[in-house]
């Protein structure tokens, strides 16, 4: 059963995603906001996003981060230098939430969907953190640290200024080189993957569904990237807008989870440099390198 959307394809019927946002590490692209102090919950929340990577394996890519005061009190989601998904919540010198997947996410030609759903009030430890990829719960980890029951998490804590990021982490290198689409943060609820997607009845491909009717909570956000003049615009109804850093209208794309475009493949290269979401390949005047899609 296919559970990713391969290159040069579209998912027929149902909900259509019109836009994505292209992040380029070389341009220091990111989105930033000040997370509000009136959280719906410090114990429950969900992040959901579709991603199509553009950075070659060997470079860490920060997807989402929230820093409360310093390196000892922050949380982040990244695809690390080994292409594993990593979820960390660090506070007070400890890591009450720390997960590294065994699976490696190296595909440059396909869109992939992730859901990180947390509820520390759950009595069963394994129910407190659930991570899904393309509709399937991940159960194989090289690192799996579950929070104690009723733990308040820095991942959900607000009140800080300009330290809630998409595509970056405060004061660190390794910004995101990827396309992002349908980015959702739910404040106060542990959602299932089926709140964000479904398997196509004909192809079996995991595809997005309309999320506009979800309850987002006080600090919740939904970025659909449909306004090229305001790529950080929140359409959840909360107006929890992000500030755009170095992104411009040309970084809005129509390469989406329901309309996947072919891009150049950075796994096949010589001395050239890929950029702009693997749409550009730069070589020196003396080189005769080529690139493949």
Predicted regions and their residues:
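Extracellular glycan-interaction surfaces
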Residues: 2-25, 48-57, 76-151
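Short hydrophobic/aromatic patches on beta-strands that form ligand-binding or substrate-lining surfaces
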Residues: 47-53, 114-116, 166, 180-185, ...
């Amino acid at each position: 059963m296919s559970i990713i959307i391969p290159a040069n394809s579209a998912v027929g019927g149902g909900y259509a995603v019109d836009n994505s946002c292209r992040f380029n590490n070389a341009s220091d692209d990111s989105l930033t906001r000040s997370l509000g102090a009136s959280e719906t919950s410090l114990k429950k929340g969900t992040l959901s996003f579709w991603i199509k990577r553009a950075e070659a394996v060997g470079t860490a890519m920060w997807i989402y981060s929230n820093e409360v005061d310093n390196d000892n009190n922050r949380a982040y989601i990244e695809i690390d230098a080994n292409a594993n998904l990593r979820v960390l919540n660090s506070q007070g010198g400890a890591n009450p939430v720390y997960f590294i997947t065994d699976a490696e996410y190296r595909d440059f030609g396909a869109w992939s969907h992730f859901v990180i759903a947390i509820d520390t009030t759950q009595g069963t430890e394994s129910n407190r953190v659930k991570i899904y990829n393309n509709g399937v719960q991940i159960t194989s980890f090289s690192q799996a640290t579950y929070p104690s029951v009723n733990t308040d998490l820095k991942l959900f804590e607000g009140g800080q200024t300009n330290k809630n990021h998409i595509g970056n982490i405060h004061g660190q290198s390794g910004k995101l080189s990827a396309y992002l689409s349908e980015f959702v943060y739910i404040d106060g609820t542990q959602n299932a993957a089926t709140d964000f997607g479904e398997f196509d009845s004909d192809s079996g491909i995991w595809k997005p569904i309309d999320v506009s009717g979800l309850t987002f909570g006080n600090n919740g956000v939904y970025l659909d990237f449909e306004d090229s003049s305001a790529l950080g615009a929140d359409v959840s109804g909360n107006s929890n807008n992000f500030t755009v850093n170095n992104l411009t209208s040309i970084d809005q794309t129509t390469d989406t989870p329901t309309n996947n475009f072919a891009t150049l493949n950075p796994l096949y290269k010589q001395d050239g440099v890929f950029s702009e979401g693997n749409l550009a390949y730069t070589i020196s005047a003396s080189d005769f390198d080529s690139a493949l899609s």
